[in-house]
């Protein structure tokens, strides 16, 4: 009989494939630079990117903190607005018929084209980039929340009717807990969408942040710093995604979702 896997064994089994893939990509990257003798402005070596990440050429802490605030703010705004609208869609068929076409219209707007309008209305700063990130990330939360609130076991709803529970109580005690896995799955998508939105905003309407660093360093052919900014963006995105995964395991440990 096989012995139960220890905590260390579970961690290794869970993260070893990703770590192995990461190492393989680094080796392939370094091999391509070495074999093809690529110039630094085309593709810098991994070690050169690490040096750029830890160097003092760029005030990384300042740019990193600004982008992090934008991403977290965009994620929080998209999540809150998305859940609220999803509840509204599921609450009333009239609201659903009124809101869904409008939300689809908003979601299909090209966000790069909307970004300059936010700059015109709000000026430079963190808020426009947060709004762009929220605009990209809110729609999956709306749809998943509405679906989760609707896909409820009829026996549970019958139980609520037996006790003459009002509609708001059925939502609070039956429908919303049922929607947790759907909402949390959507928030994982929103976590990455918030990163994309914040960086798009910094490309168009910012004078600070990691997206701004990429734009300025590409213009000067300083590719190692541009790659370093990309890595820092990925680190922030992974951190936000990881926090959502941890929250999902605590709030809805029964949910079968892909981490």
Region spans (language model):
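Hydrophobic alpha-helical transmembrane segments of polytopic membrane proteins
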Residues: 211-246
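Transmembrane alpha-helical segments of polytopic membrane transport and secretion proteins
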Residues: 1-21, 242-259
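Short hydrophobic, aromatic-rich alpha-helical segments embedded in or entering the lipid bilayer
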Residues: 44-54, 205-218
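Short cytoplasmic-facing helical segments at TM-TM junctions of multi-pass membrane proteins
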Residues: 141-144, 148-189, 210, 214
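Generic hydrophobic transmembrane alpha-helix motif, especially the helices
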Residues: 103-140, 147-148
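Transmembrane alpha-helices
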Residues: 131, 135, 168-201, 228, ...
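Periplasmic/extracellular loop-to-transmembrane helix junction in inner-membrane transport proteins
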Residues: 3-8, 35-79
